[in-house]
Amino acid sequence: MKKFCIISLVCLAGCTSTPRNPEAWMEREINACLPTAIAFREGLRKYNVWSEVLVARWWDGKRSRGHAYTVYLYPPGKNQLWTYDSWGSYRSRAYTNNPLMVAQTANLQRNLSIDRLTAEYLK
């Protein structure tokens, strides 16, 4: 019975997973957040999943920094917003038409406190 419960949990977890990056090797590369986000967005669009690349920029006191996320609605037909980067996918509670709010929420979920943040969707 114990084995059955464990197998059931593993199968159930596999059914509720979020999409994976088609170019997983990019996740290991340093400073590859933008090409990773673009590849993930294109992979989602093949399956008619709404997705955009969000570019966030900030000043850390010494120099300009930035990071890219893929923002997507998953599963299709649901209004559930997710953000993806090399840390993984996180469910976000923000409006898709407000890139700054999406970036702030994504940073908070990753325990990043960033002042003077700007954000926009990649065109």
Predicted regions and their residues:
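A structural boundary/capping signal
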Residues: C15-K123
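Sec-dependent N-terminal signal peptides
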Residues: F4-A13
